[in-house]
């Protein structure tokens, strides 16, 4: 049985009485569980046999994610919590270009064929913003859509499908995000357009979740180092700066947000960074769209990378450093992380999402999530200003 926290119960109650709306909840607030609980109610509602109906009314639910990795993670979570309940019989389809153990396609005709042949079952479709238009093109009936990390939906290529489904009276649409995206230009999509996005049916503050013990407060740490001109810091010096900063943080599980993919590769290939990590008892790993997953110098599949990352995160005594550029910042659940090191500046959304990776309550010994910026050039100075502003917003 799914047990909801008080703020989650408020969200689910609001979803049951509003056919459209925005749910603003900080990272770590358990929004996926709210989707699952609502889906359970929707699927159960179709089991009520009408007087003249020979079959129950089956439902189709779509879950939209910004990345394939998050779509796969959502799929696993839904399957785990919905389980094998015979009253929740369902078929699962993935509509994206990634690998999955479930049926998968991005062909509109194939989507319609799958939908029609499974008319006796409830249906769950996991897709990305890149591929949502394929479901639209299929012409299938959709009952409910959960737009996760909904700030992505305002992007020019993603907005038409969002606008289409939001404009249908018989489709429930919910937009989940910690960081709603607003645009000042009337010509650009914006989440303050209530005709498309609805009202904010629930807005949960980070301070409420911190006070309730559901997430941890972030702790800002600025590591001041020898200053150099931007672009003039040799990679061996960046390696030393990073190692000094990791030592300063004094924790076991560290996420490094690199400036460029090339910076990660150069640190690994051209310096003693990894060997010095090993001498400190740290394993190391990184993943990029160009190199794939690397664990302690060995190439691994994406599945093995994330399985290892999850396992290490749950192992209290394990020490590791994971480097990335952007692939781990949004939505991806990485348990156990204790500190995030910002090597580069980001927008407000990306900073908030990254901080969200380290303020989850993963173990009893963790009292806060460390948010650290090593400062050795002008990039570091500007990064401190933006990251500090986000931390202050979370704590206010």
Task: Give names to the regions the model predicted.
Residues 53, 69-105, 275:
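Conserved helix-turn-beta segment of the N-terminal RecA-like "Helicase ATP-binding" lobe
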Residues 198-265, 270-271:
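Conserved interdomain linker/interface between the two RecA-like ATPase lobes of SF2 helicase motors
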Residues 1-24:
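Conserved pre-motif I regulatory segment
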Residues 18-42:
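Walker A/P-loop
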Residues 85-136:
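Inter-Walker segment of RecA-like/P-loop motor cores
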Residues 151-152, 289-396:
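Conserved RecA-like P-loop NTPase helicase motor core
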Residues 32-37, 51-80, 259-265:
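Conserved Walker A/P-loop ATP-binding site and its immediately adjacent core
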Residues 151-215:
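Post-DEXD/H (motif II) to motif III coupling segment of the RecA-like Helicase ATP-binding lobe
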């Amino acid at each position: 049985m799914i047990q909801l926290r008080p703020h989650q119960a408020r969200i689910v109650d609001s979803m049951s009485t509003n056919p459209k709306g925005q749910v603003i909840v900080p990272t770590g607030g358990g929004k996926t569980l709210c989707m699952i609980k609502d889906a359970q109610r929707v699927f159960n509602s179709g089991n009520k046999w009408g007087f003249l109906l020979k079959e129950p009314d089956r439902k189709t639910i779509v879950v939209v994610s910004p990345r394939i990795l998050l779509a796969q993670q959502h799929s696993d979570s839904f399957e785990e919590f919905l389980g094998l309940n015979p009253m929740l019989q369902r078929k699962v389809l993935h509509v994206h270009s990634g690998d999955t153990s479930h049926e998968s396609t991005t062909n509109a005709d194939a989507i319609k064929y799958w939908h029609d042949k499974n008319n006796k079952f409830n249906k769950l479709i996991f897709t990305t913003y890149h591929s949502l238009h394929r479901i639209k093109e299929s012409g299938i009936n959709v009952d409910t859509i959960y737009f996760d990390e909904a700030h992505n939906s305002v992007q020019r290529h993603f907005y038409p499908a969002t606008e289409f489904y939001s404009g249908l009276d018989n489709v429930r649409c919910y937009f989940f995000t910690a960081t709603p995206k607003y645009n000042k230009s009337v010509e650009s999509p914006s989440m303050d357009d209530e005709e498309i996005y609805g009202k904010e049916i629930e807005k949960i503050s980070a301070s409420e979740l911190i006070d309730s013990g559901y997430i941890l407060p972030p702790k800002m740490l600025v590591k001041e180092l020898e200053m150099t001109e931007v672009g003039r810091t040799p990679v061996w010096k960046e390696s030393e700066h990073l190692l000094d900063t990791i030592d300063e943080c004094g924790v076991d599980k560290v996420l490094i947000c690199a400036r460029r993919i090339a910076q990660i590769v150069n640190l690994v290939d051209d310096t003693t960074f990894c060997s010095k990590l090993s001498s400190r008892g740290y394993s190391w790993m990184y993943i990029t769209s160009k190199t794939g997953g690397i664990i302690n110098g060995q190439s691994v599949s994406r599945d093995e990378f994330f399985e290892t990352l999850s396992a290490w995160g749950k192992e209290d005594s394990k020490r590791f450093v994971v480097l990335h550029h952007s692939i781990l910042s949004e939505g991806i659940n990485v348990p156990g992380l204790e500190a995030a090191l910002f090597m580069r500046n980001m927008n407000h959304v990306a900073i908030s999402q990254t901080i969200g990776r380290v303020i989850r309550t993963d173990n009893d010994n963790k009292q806060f999530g460390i948010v650290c910026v090593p400062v050795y050039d002008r990039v570091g100075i500007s990064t401190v200003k933006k990251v500090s502003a986000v931390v202050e917003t979370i704590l206010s």
